[in-house]
């Protein structure tokens, strides 16, 4: 109750002076303390906001880089797969060429062997014919005790060969 009595005991002039002094003190505090304090708080809020915005931009940039890296990785894998497939195809093609060349060479060697065998057979038959003809002439000469002329010999050989061919 002391405060109420004191307030009522104050004269109006003192009360008016105290109110004006209080308002003046509030105005000075607003200019001196509140203004710089709000300025510091606003600057701090702006810095926090810009840091958040910067972090968001950095996050978006990181996501963008990550997606680029993923795309590059996929492209690299695709290129590597293509290189491997191309190498396999090239190796298969080269293998086919080597096999084809070997088959051609084998066919050529086989054909040459057949040709050589045929020639040897013909030479053997021809040699055998000549030997048989000479033997036949010798036997016939001995049997006949005379020597055949060249024409008679040839006729006898031809007859003997045709007789052999029919058998």
UniProtKB/Swiss-Prot annotation:
Function of the protein: F(1)F(0) ATP synthase produces ATP from ADP in the presence of a proton or sodium gradient. F-type ATPases consist of two structural domains, F(1) containing the extramembraneous catalytic core and F(0) containing the membrane proton channel, linked together by a central stalk and a peripheral stalk. During catalysis, ATP synthesis in the catalytic domain of F(1) is coupled via a rotary mechanism of the central stalk subunits to proton translocation. Component of the F(0) channel, it forms part of the peripheral stalk, linking F(1) to F(0).
Pfam family, one: ATP-synt_B
Places the protein is found: Cell membrane
GO MF term list: proton-transporting ATP synthase activity, rotational mechanism; proton-transporting ATPase activity, rotational mechanism
Topology of the protein relative to the lipid bilayer: Single-pass membrane protein
Keywords, alphabetical: ATP synthesis, Cell membrane, CF(0), Hydrogen ion transport, Ion transport, Membrane, Transmembrane, Transmembrane helix, Transport
CDD domains recorded: ATP-synt_Fo_b
Similarity remark: Belongs to the ATPase B chain family.
Gene Ontology cellular-component terms listed: plasma membrane; proton-transporting ATP synthase complex
Name the UniProt record assigns to this protein: ATP synthase subunit b
Source superkingdom: Bacteria
Main location: membrane
Residue ranges crossing the lipid bilayer per the database entry: 9-29
InterPro entries assigned to the protein according to its UniProt record, in alphabetical order: ATP_synth_b/b'su_bac/chlpt (IPR002146), ATP_synth_F0_bsu_bac (IPR005864), ATP_synthase_B_chain (IPR050059)
Subunit architecture: F-type ATPases have 2 components, F(1) - the catalytic core - and F(0) - the membrane proton channel. F(1) has five subunits: alpha(3), beta(3), gamma(1), delta(1), epsilon(1). F(0) has three main subunits: a(1), b(2) and c(10-14). The alpha and beta chains form an alternating ring which encloses part of the gamma chain. F(1) is attached to F(0) by a central stalk formed by the gamma and epsilon chains, while a peripheral stalk is formed by the delta and b chains.
